[in-house]
């Protein structure tokens, strides 16, 4: 009886939440409600939605990953230490990647350090975290392998990404080209690119990626628990699945980081798909024991 009651309460709460979210989004997307970047501002102190949602995404992902690490028999003190270093490297990598592609917009080092205002790139974060994880495992010799750690990391990363993308929503960024589709999103003129200043409605690409990230999280979670044979397989699948969605969605975005005439995210995603697919085939065909990886 208690289980049934708990299920009904969760179902009712979830239904109310999604109804509220639908109504709220419909009003924002139509332009009836204009968003603020700030949760509140008191004097010189301000709390932004962007940084809050990034932090929320990290914390939820961290606790899910920690539970999985415990089930894997991993020393949790070592795991927490790796996460600490990985987060620092991830933030530095995410910001550095973004700033390097937008140097002309940063007049000083202080401007480049204002990560709470937005401007983090997931590819830079992943590169920074993976490099740090590799060095940590090589130097500290913990109770887990590098690929075991990356599997834990990438199995929950899409969940954090799905939540963090809503920070772009409140910043009116990471949207796509103009559209007249029923789910079009109103963007105030100050946030529109100059070439699209006469358009009012755009593709909500932040929402597309958030939904895709959530789907990737569920797919990787199922694979992690039921089908994984070798450490590293989940990491390879993350590279493939996330990158497939990113390549498609990036085609619509108007604020992409560029390498010449090529969108950097699409180029790097194509490389990750190739590496991930190749790595997955090698790992699945290997006869070595799981621990070797």
UniProtKB/Swiss-Prot annotation:
Pathway assignment: Protein modification; lipoprotein biosynthesis (diacylglyceryl transfer)
Gene Ontology annotations of biological process type: lipoprotein biosynthetic process
Pfam family, one: LGT
Keywords for the protein's UniProt record, in alphabetical order: Cell inner membrane, Cell membrane, Membrane, Transferase, Transmembrane, Transmembrane helix
UniProt GO molecular function: phosphatidylglycerol-prolipoprotein diacylglyceryl transferase activity
Cellular location(s): Cell inner membrane
Keyword hit for Zinc: no
Binding site for a 1,2-diacyl-sn-glycero-3-phospho-(1'-sn-glycerol): 165
Membrane protein topology class: Multi-pass membrane protein
EC number(s) on file: 2.5.1.145
Enzyme category, top tier: transferase
Regions that span the bilayer: 45-65, 81-101, 115-135, 144-164, 204-224, 231-249, 262-282
One of the record's GO cellular component terms: plasma membrane
UniProt superkingdom: Bacteria
Presence of the UniProt keyword Transferase in the record: yes
InterPro entries: Lgt
Annotated function: Catalyzes the transfer of the diacylglyceryl group from phosphatidylglycerol to the sulfhydryl group of the N-terminal cysteine of a prolipoprotein, the first step in the formation of mature lipoproteins.
Family: Belongs to the Lgt family.
HAMAP family according to UniProt: Lgt
Protein name: Phosphatidylglycerol--prolipoprotein diacylglyceryl transferase
Source species: Thermotoga maritima (strain ATCC 43589 / DSM 3109 / JCM 10099 / NBRC 100826 / MSB8)
Recorded name of the encoding gene: lgt
């Amino acid at each position: 009886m208690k289980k049934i009651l708990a299920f009904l309460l969760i179902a009712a709460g979830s239904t109310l939440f999604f109804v509220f979210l639908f109504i709220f989004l419909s009003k924002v997307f139509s332009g009836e409600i204009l968003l603020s970047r700030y949760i509140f501002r008191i004097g010189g102190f301000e709390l932004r939605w962007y940084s809050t949602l990034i932090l929320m995404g990290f914390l939820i992902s961290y606790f899910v990953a920690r539970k999985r690490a415990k089930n894997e028999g991993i020393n949790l003190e070592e795991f927490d230490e790796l996460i600490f270093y990985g987060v620092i490297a991830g933030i530095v990598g995410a910001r550095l990647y973004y700033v390097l592609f937008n140097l002309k917009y940063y007049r000083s080092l202080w401007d480049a350090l204002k990560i709470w205002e937005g401007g983090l790139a997931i590819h830079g974060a992943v590169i920074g975290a993976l490099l740090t994880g590799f060095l940590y495992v090589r130097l500290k010799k913990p109770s887990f392998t590098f690929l075991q750690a990356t599997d834990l990391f990438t199995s929950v990363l899409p969940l954090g990404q799905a939540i963090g993308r809503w920070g772009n929503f409140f910043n009116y960024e990471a949207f796509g080209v103009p559209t007249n589709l029923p789910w079009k999103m109103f963007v105030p003129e100050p946030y529109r690119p100059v070439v699209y200043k006469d358009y009012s409605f755009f593709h909500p690409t932040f929402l597309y990626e958030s939904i895709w990230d959530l789907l990737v999280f569920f797919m990787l979670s199922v694979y992690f628990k039921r089908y994984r044979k070798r450490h590293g397989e989940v990491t390879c699948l993350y590279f493939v699945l996330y990158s497939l969605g990113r390549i498609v969605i990036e085609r619509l975005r108007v604020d992409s980081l560029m390498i010449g005439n090529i969108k950097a995210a699409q180029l790097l995603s194509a490389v990750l798909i190739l590496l991930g697919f190749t790595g997955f085939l090698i790992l699945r065909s290997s006869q070595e024991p799981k621990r070797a990886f």
